[in-house]
Amino acid sequence: MEPVFYEGDILLLRKWGMPQKGDIVAAYIEERDYVVVKRILAVEGDYITVACGRVYLNGEKVAEPVNGMQGGSRRQELEYRLSPDQYFLIGENQEVSVDSRAFGCVGKSAVRGTVVCKLF
């Protein structure tokens, strides 16, 4: 699958309103000191299980393993019940994306805006 956005793309962000499940957002990942552009997969009340890199949303499989996350990954099995201030983000190219499977849920305060369109 081809990436939707590439490093260096200029994106127009909507910075008001609350992003919804399915929206593509730009979020700052403090632990890694960079901004990611990912889709919101889960919101408040959703239950996420990550097992061997596969992601299950409320019990249904929605994503395949990220390269290098299968088998002995230290994040082999995680469970999240999302609180009102959290999102679980997933990349469009799920086989290679570094997303919430790698860095966990993100707080709503980390979201810089919802992507409206790519300008350049």
Model-predicted regions and their roles:
Residues 1-120:
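Extended hydrophobic leader/signal-anchor segments used for secretion and membrane insertion
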